[in-house]
């Protein structure tokens, strides 16, 4: 299928050929000069009309040619928008299907009109078991933290280490080194 610019070029060629054929000299077939002059005036008027019509057609074709790139750009943009809409609709459809699946799962587990199935009961048991294990692990972590504190205190007492004194010495050394390097101690 030819595109619009090929069709327009073809029409221009036909119009140009029509102009060339109209400019051929007229043959003198008439018997008297009056009829020949009348025929020349008639053909001159019709030639002027044809030329005006041809110029008008050429102007309209030029106008169409100038609008053609804009139309192509609009079609391209519409295709992109159409593709984006298709993608959005596809995503919405997927989300809707996911929500429906989730609704079915939730409604089967919570629906008071449906008895508790074996699957639901098993799931509930697993959740309760995990909650119980989580509680036990929290207790054990707290116990381990307490044990570490107790062991640290016992170690410090056995070796006669004054933890507060050690911390104060380290802080004093840092302040001293900052003072030597010329750093401001208020940057903390």
UniProtKB/Swiss-Prot annotation:
The keyword Transmembrane is annotated on this UniProt entry: no
Coiled coil: none
The keyword Iron is assigned to this record: no
Subcellular location: Archaeal flagellum
Record-level GO cellular component terms: archaeal-type flagellum
Keywords from the UniProt entry: Archaeal flagellum
One Pfam family this sequence matches: FlaC_arch
Subcellular location, principal: other
Similarity remark: To M.jannaschii FlaC.
Protein's UniProt name: Putative flagella-related protein C
Organism (species): Methanococcus voltae
Organism taxonomic ancestry: Archaea, Methanobacteriati, Methanobacteriota, Methanomada group, Methanococci
The encoding gene: flaC
């Amino acid at each position: 299928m030819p595109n619009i610019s090929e069709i327009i070029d073809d029409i221009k060629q036909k119009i140009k050929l029509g102009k060339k054929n109209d400019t051929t000299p007229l043959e003198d077939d008439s018997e008297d000069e009056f009829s020949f002059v009348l025929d020349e005036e008639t053909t001159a008027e019709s030639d002027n009309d044809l030329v005006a019509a041809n110029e008008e057609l050429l102007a309209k074709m030029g106008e169409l040619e100038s609008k053609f790139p804009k139309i192509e750009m609009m079609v391209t943009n519409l295709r992109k928008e159409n593709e984006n809409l298709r993608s959005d609709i596809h995503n919405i459809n997927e989300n809707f299907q996911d929500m429906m699946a989730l609704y079915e799962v939730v409604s089967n587990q919570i629906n008071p009109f449906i008895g508790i199935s074996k699957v639901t009961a098993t799931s509930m048991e697993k959740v309760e078991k995990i909650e119980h294990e989580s509680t036990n692990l929290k207790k054990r972590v707290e116990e381990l933290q307490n044990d570490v504190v107790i062991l640290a205190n016992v170690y410090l007492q056995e070796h006669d280490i004054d933890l507060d004194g050690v911390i104060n010495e380290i802080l004093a050394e840092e302040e001293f080194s900052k003072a030597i390097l010329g750093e401001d101690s208020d940057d903390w």
